[in-house]
Amino acid sequence: MTTAPQTLNTDVAIVGAGPTALFAAFECGMLKLSCVLIDALDSVGGQCAALYPEKPIYDIPAHPAIEGGALIEALEQQIAPFDVPRLLGSRVETLEGQRGAFTLKTARGDVITAKAVIIAAGAGAFGPNRPPLDGLEAYERTGAVQYYVKKRADFTGKRVVVAGGGDSALDWALSLSEVAAQVYLLHRRDRFRGAPETLSRIEQQIAAGKIEKVVPYQLHALHGTDGVLSTVEVTTLEGTSRHIEADALLPFYGLSTDLGPIALWGLDTHRNTVPVTPATLESSTPGIFAIGDVATYPGKLKLILQGFSEGAMAAHAIHAIVHPDTALHFEYSTSKGVPG
């Protein structure tokens, strides 16, 4: 990770370093466009690496299942031939200029000049929605309360309460049921929101005694000493209380997101996203493009695979900005290989 402030000149500045950003860097390399990856996190990978490194992803083409961390490793191998610079651990604060001549400055003092910009910042700055429980911070400090599973093995033999009613809660309840002593799946409603196959697997694990469904209950209090959790107290809306002996609590109540400085860059925005032209992924500001979850347009699907396609489309559109007098002749990678 680069720590000293850098001054770089490049064809394309890519704001973000998640999977969509990494593939956009690959596409830039294939078109012989220089680029730099800039991210506030200390390592590449975005949410895949920071939040879900061991969570399987099922809709990446040619991979029946691949964990988030493994996907990032593969993408890093793919861009390795292009030796893409990375400015990590400091977010972009300001973006000024015009198409063909932009200047970006980070909080650390890095200065990047670029002919075009790709914003691949996911949902922007993100953080977990934390349950309003007294004394929560003490349990967060010890790891008794966690919002992201980085190492499933850490929960081996433990009693784990998984709170939430969506895909993340269901997926992690299933995954942890393979290593934990017991998983309690807590939701304030009787029904969960998930794919039929996932719900079927949940029922199988319930029948096997690996998961216990605790509904309709919601979190009420945590009990323990010095951040060591002993019981999770839950209640119904009618006030019925239950104490669950547990070693860990994993609340999956979604992420709170914020565009942060991006909202101050003069771009049209809509509900924490950047509207773009679907054919090019260009924003309201010529020369600034947005791809991945931060981009929006009619028919948009928030899928990694669609972000990959958007990265390719943006890179091809940018080629005309960087090389306005050179026609781009489309070639398949099988014909031209990877440029050296």
Swiss-Prot record:
Top EC category: oxidoreductase
Coiled coil segments of this chain: none
Positions with a binding annotation for FAD: T20, D39, Q47, Y52, V92, F126, D293, T334
Gene3D superfamilies (UniProt xref): FAD/NAD(P)-binding domain
A GO MF term: flavin adenine dinucleotide binding
Entry annotated with the keyword Flavoprotein: yes
Its EC number(s): 1.18.1.2
Pfam families assigned to the protein according to its UniProt record, in alphabetical order: Pyr_redox_2
Subunit annotation: Homodimer.
Family of this protein: Belongs to the ferredoxin--NADP reductase type 2 family.
Name of this chain's protein: Ferredoxin--NADP reductase
Lineage, broadest ranks: Bacteria, Pseudomonadati, Pseudomonadota, Alphaproteobacteria, Acetobacterales
